[in-house]
Amino acid sequence: MYFSSVIDRPAYCKRHVVKLGRLRDDLARARNTPNLVYITPDLCHDGHDASCADGGPGGLKAVNAWMKRWVPRILRSTAYRRDGVLVITADESDGPQSDATACCGEGASANSPMPGIVGPGGGRIGALVLSRYVKPNTWSTTPYNHYSLLGSIEEIFRLRKLGYARTAGLDTFGLDVYNSGWNE
């Protein structure tokens, strides 16, 4: 977690950034589950590292094991089954085949004068959106980026859009994604 608005405020950070193990208790009862849970795996389980600090395997093997442990818990929870949405995505593409160009006309901004590692963007990645509001086997051809996801979350919670998410013309998730009872 590297947001200066969080880490530069230790008391706030201590109250709001909690260990992942707490999620197990939060999921036990729908009323305990926060309306928004943002999970970032540690550096061992984020799919990047070739090995973990303890010498165990990292990379895709570690992230797959991590997801096998946590995703079923989330999907079985009452809160998720009632009205939840689980989005699984990556922060950037990686590897010799990756294309680091930006999606969706993303340009430079104050927070990211050169988005991406090799150029303007983090490359092409996918997102898996699981919810009762998404029909199985849905495939959207609309190009989205991380700001689209942020803007979609802000719309759901009726929040003012932040940064690049408020850029005119930026697509947010619509009926191509939420295509099963979203507005019913």
Residue ranges and their predicted role:
Residues 1-184:
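N-terminal pro-sequences and low-complexity stem/linker regions of secreted or lumenal proteins
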